[in-house]
Each structure stands twice: as C-alpha cells, then as structure tokens.
Amino acid sequence: MEVSTSYCTPAVNFKYGSFQDSDVSMREDDLFRMGSYNSQGYYADGTHLDGSIGEEDETSSGSNDQHMDFEEDDFDMESSMTEDLVDEDEEEEDEEDNDEWTNQKRTDNQNSVAYYAAMEMLRIRFPFQSIAIRISDFCCLQEKDLLNDTMIDFYLNHIVEHVLPDSNGSNVTVLPSIFWHNLSLRQHAFDSEDEKMMSDEQKMDLKFGDLHDFVADFDLQDFDYIVVPVNEWEHWSLAVICHPFTAQARTVIFDSQLTADLNNLQNMATLIESFMKYSYEKRTGNAMPFPLPCILPQRMPQQTNNFDCGIFIAEFARRFLLSPPKDLDNFDFAREYPDFSTATKRTEMQRVVLSLSTNRARWRPLVELLNGYSTAAPHRAL
C-alpha cells in the first residue's frame, strides 16, 4: 500500500440520524396521561380508584341529600371521637405498610442487574479528563465485545500518563472521544440556504466555534502529538496529529479494517485539518503556516472479526507513541513494529484497571467470570 499524502477528495455527506416532523404522527386523543382519572372515579386505564364512591354509597349519598335536617341532640360525640381514632390508626398502619414497600423496593433495586452494572470500580483524574469506570464499562473487556468510549478514553490517557517514560521528551495529549463526535456533526452544520447568507468567517464560527472553546484550556501548539479517537458507525479508528503547525506536521490515520475506498479516512484528515486551521487563526490571528497532510501507514495489521477495532487502536497508540517513526512519509507499520500483537490486550487492560483500583481484590472474581465467557457469542455493539 502506498503512503497517501493526497486528500483533496470531495467531502462525503454523513447523515447522523436525521429527524423530520413527518416521522412522528401523534393525535391528541392518543395521549395517555399517567395517573389521570375522570369524574366517575376511574383511572384512564379503567382501574377503579380505591377511595371512589361505589353503587351502595352513591345510593346512600343520594338519600342523605333528601334528609339533611337532624337534631343536634342526636349527635354522638363519643362515637365520633372513636371513629376518628380508628381512622388515625388505619393511616399509621398504611404509612408503615408504605415504608415496608419502599424498603423492599430499594432492596430489589440493589439486587438488580442495573444496580450492579452502575457500580463504580475506579475513578481517576487525568490532566484534562476525569474518568469513572463502572462494571458495565469493564465488561466491555471480555472477549468478543466492542470497547466503549469510556475504556478507550481511559486507556489512551493511561498510555500518556503511566506508560510513556519521562525521558521520552514528547509532549502528548489525548482528546476525548466525544470531541470527534461533535466535530463530525459540525461538518454540515448549516444548509445551503443559510450558507448563502454567511461570510466565510461566520461559516467557520458556526462549524468550529464551540469546539474551539472545548480545547480552550490548553494550547494545541504546545504538543508534539495530539491523539484523537474516532468512532464512525460503531467502528474505532485513530488519528494522531504529529508536530502541529510545523513543517513536519502530519496526521497519521490508523485503521484495522481498511477497505478499497479510502475517501472516508482522507475526509477525516481533511476535517481535522480544517479545525486545526480555525483554532490556529483564532489564537494567533494568522493563517496556519503549514498544511497538515494525511499519512496512512503501509502494511497495517488488520482485524479478522467485527469487534476488535478498539483493541487494535489501543495497541496502535501504545506502539506509535512509545516509538514514533522518524520518517512519517514512508511509514511502513510492519517494518517499524514487526512483533505487533493484540492477543493479550484485553487481559492487559483488565490488569491496568485493577492495578489502579483501591479495592482490587473485590473485583477479581468479576475478572475470572468475564474471562470464563471467552467463548460466548458476540455481544451487541455498545
């Protein structure tokens, strides 16, 4: 595969779940109001209210309307007080029953799968991200499952903060996976009619203004490498911006499921370059001095299934950041990293999470359980 440095291809129109008024047809008389009831004392679903008037009560009520006159001497105060005390006792019993029901419901919730899935295993603060890993996130590390954004963000930051040696001399940062999601949505942030009414500066502000604020806490010029995890259509790939705003500036794209059509990857690099241009001009008031060509490494390892893309980009990032090629324009992956393997990557990532957890012994049975399911059927993409 030849190194691709040309990316002047027309942009591809991506559609991320458009919504139209015609997609929903709802009549007012179809609306169901939970807990509403009518004048006959029935809920909307036909359930009779406990405190509603029954047939016998309605009869007696009607007769009482005709005999409202009574003698004051006939009023039995003792009987009335006794009835009031009985009513109070019944109310207290109802409250106790409600408390028991509430406690039982709370216990049931704590025993539910959702309760355990939301339990937090690790909370860690990286320089620009605070990440909480829950059991549901950790379960993505079992075989035949796709990694979710939490595990991708965690491991990429772990590489930068805990794996790269201080003597490396490179300044590296990781943008969270939500960055690419927001960036990709901005590429068609306005329709053709709006575009005609806007200046070039207004168009760029509309597309990238919010994202520029997103990275306002640090200067992109301070970094030698900017790592950008990319998720498109439930597939992970990786973009690494190398030496931005210098003559050596390149965007290296890593993908473990290449197709004959590389336009999508080239468009990815083009969108990243557009944002970098915008960010540089906003910070300095000048045009970006150097272009940001796209590099696609030759002989890149490819996955043989539909669920290991996240595992591959995790190892791509580790290998590349530990030992970046000196000549990016002739980047041959197989030559640079001949012993590349992802065979034990999932268990390695499990060990990393446990090593940083303050209660690691508590989670070891979970690890054994997950690894015991290594032959299970593939799970739905997260």
Swiss-Prot record:
Region (Disordered): 46-106
Enzyme Commission no: 3.4.22.-
Subcellular localization: Cytoplasm, Cytoskeleton, Microtubule organizing center, Centrosome; Nucleus; Cytoplasm; Mitochondrion matrix
Tissue: Expressed in hermaphrodite-specific neurons, head muscles, body wall muscles and pharyngeal cells.
An annotated GO cellular component: centrosome
UniProt KW keywords: Cytoplasm, Cytoskeleton, Hydrolase, Mitochondrion, Nucleus, Protease, Thiol protease, Ubl conjugation pathway
Alphabetical GO biological process terms: determination of adult lifespan; innate immune response; mitochondrial unfolded protein response; positive regulation of protein import into nucleus; protein desumoylation; protein sumoylation; proteolysis
Stated induction or repression of this protein's expression: Up-regulated in response to mitochondrial stress induced by antimycin A.
Composition bias type Acidic residues, residue spans: 84-100
A UniProt-annotated Pfam family: Peptidase_C48
Gene disruption phenotype: Animals are viable, but sterile and display phenotypes including an increased lifespan, age-dependent decline in their pharyngeal pumping rate and locomotion, reduced body fat and decreased oxygen consumption and an impaired ability to maintain mitochondrial membrane potential.
Statement: the UniProt record of this protein carries the keyword Nucleus: yes
InterPro entries (UniProt xref): Papain-like_cys_pep_sf, Peptidase_C48_C
SUPFAM superfamilies: Cysteine proteinases
Positions of disulphide bridges: none
UniProt cross-references to PANTHER family, sorted A to Z: UBIQUITIN-LIKE PROTEASE 4 (PTHR46915:SF2), UBIQUITIN-LIKE PROTEASE 4-RELATED (PTHR46915)
Function: Protease required for deconjugation of smo-1 conjugates from target proteins which is necessary for cell cycle progression. Required for respiration and the maintenance of normal mitochondrial homeostasis. In response to mitochondrial stress, required for the removal of smo-1 conjugates from the transcription factor dve-1, which promotes the translocation of dve-1 from the cytosol to the nucleus to initiate the mitochondrial unfolded protein response.
Designated name of the protein: Ubiquitin-like protease 4
Gene: ulp-4
